[in-house]
Amino acid sequence: MGFKTGIVGLPNVGKSTLFNALTRTAAAQAANFPFCTIEPNVGEVAVPDARLAKLARIAKSQSVIPARMTFVDIAGLVKGASKGEGLGNQFLANIRETDAIAHVLRCFEDGDVTHVEGRVDPVEDAATIETELMLADLESIEKRLQNIVRKVRGGDKEALLQERLLKVAQAALEAGHPARTVDISDEERKAWDMLQLLTSKPVLYVCNVAEDEAAKGNAHSDRVTKMADEQGAASVVISARIEEEISQLDPEEAQMFLDEMGLEEAGLDRLIRAGYQLLDLQTFFTAGPKEARAWTIAKGTLAPAAAGVIHGDFEKGFIRAETIAYDDYLAYGGEAGAKDAGKMRAEGKGYVVKDGDVLHFLHSG
């Protein structure tokens, strides 16, 4: 199950520097877990999770395989992208294929790095990109409404639902609000997602600050945090230059560097976790002598669907899930101890998997 977060930003905001750090990190991790494919514009990185190493120690696992997040470097954006200016059409097509948007904003002062608008104003920069995405959505909605006129007149149920959702989105956009602000019911969610509106995607604002401001941010990043809170979006403060330096060091050197800078952890770790949370994801584990592994699922996933993440046949032939809560697995020294203490539960098809569950699936076939 792949989850893609697109990294976007205006020119000279540090987007490429940040992405280079991500891809170097991904390259360094490539030997540690399988299926890590790295293309020029894609970086697949491990999701930091201290729980996995603890499980592996208890289970005496030979290998440790973390959950993964994919970041996609989206072509640079300029004002007018919705009309095809610059690489506008490519930008919009690439963003449509992602699950969320990480919007890099310039929150640093540097006279040697020019800004396309000749000023440093991250909130205004965010508005520039948001406006382009909203204009593109409005154009897309108008075309789609025209294309379904005949089906709507014929009373086609699917077309009628699509028309209603498109008009709700259109009204929000015309009022100056992105599509993600529209309240959609669970029953309508699938049809809504199929519209693939650019502004319906969750947003993470990445405040790129100077190296000496990485620990606490600055006035610019404070404004972005306030804006994100008002929008119900997420934000993270990071120094792309620091991340690029860290990505070239071995783990021990990187930790020393972080200590010197007064940072508890790499900004990329916070960025990856924030992207994970933004997509409403959670982790379950499998642990044994061969491997300890973290698996990614959406919150609210039922046990059979979680089994299907491991292999499609597990979902089809699902019988039950032997479940141990993470804390119980640690407290009782692993599967055998937890089972003896009565902490292993047999859960059926209706079980909603919890974050941190250590699972073993029984299935037919």
PLM region descriptions:
Residues 22, 84-87, 116-119, 218-222, ...:
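Short, glycine/charged-enriched secondary-structure capping and boundary segments
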Residues 17, 34, 70, 120, ...:
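Generic signal for short, ordered secondary-structure residues
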Residues 6, 35, 40-43, 50-52, ...:
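Short capping/connector residues at structural and topological boundaries
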Residues 35, 49-52, 62-71, 85-99, ...:
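Amphipathic alpha-helical transducer elements in NTP-driven molecular machines
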Residues 43-48, 75-85, 96-157, 172-185, ...:
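Conserved Switch II/interswitch segment of TRAFAC-class P-loop GTPases
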Residues 2-8, 13, 19, 147-354, ...:
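C-terminal-of-GTPase-core extension/linker across diverse P-loop GTPases
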Residues 1-114, 142-143, 148:
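Conserved G1/Walker A P-loop phosphate-binding module
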Residues 26-34, 41-43, 51-54, 83, ...:
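Glycine-rich, flexible loop/turn motifs
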